[in-house]
Amino acid sequence: MCPVWLLVAVVVVGGSRGAVSQCWEHPSCQELNSDSSMMECIQLCHSDLTAEKPVIPGNAHLQPPPLPDPSSSSSFILPSSSSSSSSPQSKRSYSMEHFRWGKPVGRKRRPVKVYTSNGVEEESAEVFPGEMRRRELASELLAAAEEEEEKAQEVMAEEEEEQKQLLQEKKDGSYKMKHFRWSGPPASKRYGGFMKSWDERSQRPLLTLFKNVINKDGQQQK
């Protein structure tokens, strides 16, 4: 009976005295004679009593902590370790890609390529609206510059044609200084009127000149 009493002492140390006394007074445990059967009976009775233990009302910190179950503790420890190992990975993989500031500054986002029906790749304007706007402005400026160049080339071609026509006219006809005022003056005004013919001029000034000379000679002789 010594092992039985040792078992009872261990149970008394591990549990409360009221529960052990209840299990010892239980008729199913009193009818047993072997040590192993009595040990099993006391363990079963103690587990039943602890399962039926009432919850003490009041603050949660004043209630006694629940007894840990070895089978359940291992099952709880494994998920926690797995969750702790998976939590950094999940936090690491999460990134706010739906915001523009979700990515770090040094890392550039790749533009989304849209394949049109013609098979040409076009970048979506939702990813980089500023960049797309700048490209549109650059294309507009290039188109305006090309139009100005075309107009300048047309003007130069017209000027060259006019110069060719002028050269052809000079070769065919006589040279006329149309860009001077005296290019084509009337005959009466050429050289101040000294180049008139004898018929065109009046003979009265010459006659008066002769008369004046004769009169002067007569006066000197007197």
Swiss-Prot record:
One example of a Gene Ontology biological process annotation: neuropeptide signaling pathway
Single GO MF descriptor: neuropeptide hormone activity
Gene Ontology cellular-component annotations: extracellular region
The record's account of how the chain is modified after translation: Specific enzymatic cleavages at paired basic residues yield the different active peptides.
Alphabetical UniProt keywords: Cleavage on pair of basic residues, Endorphin, Hormone, Secreted, Signal
Bias kind Acidic residues: ranges: 148-162
Signal peptide: 1-18
Biased amino acid composition, Low complexity: 70-93
Propeptide: 19-90
Annotated localization: Secreted
Protein name, UniProt field: Pro-opiomelanocortin
Native source organism of the sequence: Thunnus obesus (Bigeye tuna)
